[in-house]
Each structure stands twice: as structure tokens, then as C-alpha cells.
């Protein structure tokens, strides 16, 4: 496999899959807070219709070198554009992209990322950056947010009876307790 470093023109490479992990209040794991992985990438992804609605959280060790993460790293080293990284690729936030942030923050680790990652995408690098959101406690109700990340939006959903435990099972008591216990 021909690995292409950013210094060789790779514009899609990001250090997040080598250094960072994100965990949502529902214990879903992602590349970062802005990544757009499809639901089928996650065994514990419980907020879509494409699941068994069973709570199966994934530990960091299970997640770090799973098939999805290895595929992401492999494709990034090849310079491929990833649909998971649409927010950065298309500058959807109208600001500096997270990729630039990660690559600047960990620029001294780029060579290590390439050296420690085999052709399958498996890496021996360890996570050093954690964005763990243990609950959705937030008193804001920003328009772009929702009940997954804002307790204010969750309260409004409950008050207006607009939530459905089939589609938002994390709001139901038994599952809510399991999530708290996992964290």
C-alpha cells in the first residue's frame, strides 16, 4: 500500500483516528464530535431504526482497532475522501475545520502515525485525546442541537410528548440507568 503523508499532498489525512476518541452521552463512539459515521458502523448505536434496540456499549479497546477504525485509517493514509469527514471536507461549519486543528495539535506525531500503522489500518498508537460527554446536561437550546446533547431540548421533548422510546430509547428510564452505569 502506498501511504501518502500530508507533506506529500494528502489533503484528507487527519490525526484524530490515531490520537482522539469521542464518546456521546448515549455512549456512541465516533472519530470526533463532527464525524458522520453511518449507524451500521456502531454496535451500540441506538438512535436509528437500523438496530436491534439493544444496548451494547463498546469499550475503547474494542473500538480502537475495530474494522471501521482500521478502514478509516487505511483510507486516510491512501488520501481518499471519507464520507465520515464530510463536515471538514465541505467546511459545513463555516469556520476552520477540525482536521486542521488535529493536524496542527499533533503535527509532531504524524510520522509516528504512519510508522505505527500497518496496511490493514491497525495502529499501535494509543489514544491521548478524549472528548467524553457523560451526559446531555446543557441549559442551552441551540437550533442545531437536539435532545441527545441538550437536557433543555430533552425537557422540551418530554413536556411536549414529542419523544418516542422506539426512536429515542436513551430517554427511557431502564436504558438511561444502563448508560449511567457504563460511564
Locations of regions flagged by a protein language model:
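Short, flexible hinge/linker loops that cap or flank conserved catalytic cores
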Residues: 123-124, 136, 180
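Leucine-rich repeat
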Residues: 171-175
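Canonical Radical SAM [4Fe-4S] cluster-binding loop centered on the CxxxCxxC motif
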Residues: 31-39, 131-170
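Accessory C-terminal segments flanking Radical SAM cores
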Residues: 2-131, 149-152
Amino acid at each position: 500500500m502506498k501511504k501518502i503523508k500530508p507533506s506529500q499532498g494528502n489533503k484528507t489525512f487527519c490525526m484524530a483516528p490515531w490520537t482522539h476518541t469521542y464518546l456521546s452521552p448515549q455512549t456512541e463512539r465516533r472519530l470526533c464530535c463532527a464525524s458522520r459515521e453511518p449507524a451500521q458502523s456502531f454496535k451500540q448505536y441506538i438512535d436509528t431504526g437500523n438496530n436491534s434496540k439493544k444496548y451494547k456499549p463498546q469499550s475503547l479497546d474494542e473500538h480502537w482497532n475495530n474494522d471501521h477504525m482500521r478502514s478509516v485509517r487505511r483510507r486516510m493514509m491512501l488520501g481518499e475522501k471519507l464520507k465520515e469527514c464530510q463536515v471538514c471536507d465541505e467546511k459545513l461549519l463555516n469556520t476552520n475545520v477540525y482536521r486542521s486543528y488535529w493536524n496542527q495539535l499533533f503535527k509532531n506525531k504524524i510520522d509516528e502515525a504512519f510508522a505505527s500503522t500497518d496496511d490493514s489500518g491497525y495502529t499501535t498508537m494509543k489514544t491521548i485525546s478524549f472528548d467524553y460527554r457523560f451526559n446531555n446536561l446543557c441549559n442551552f437550546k441551540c437550533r442545531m442541537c437536539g435532545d441527545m446533547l441538550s437536557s433543555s431540548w430533552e425537557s422540551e421533548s418530554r413536556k411536549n410528548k414529542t419523544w418516542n422510546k422506539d426512536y429515542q430509547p436513551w430517554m427511557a428510564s431502564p436504558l438511561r440507568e444502563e448508560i449511567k452505569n457504563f460511564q
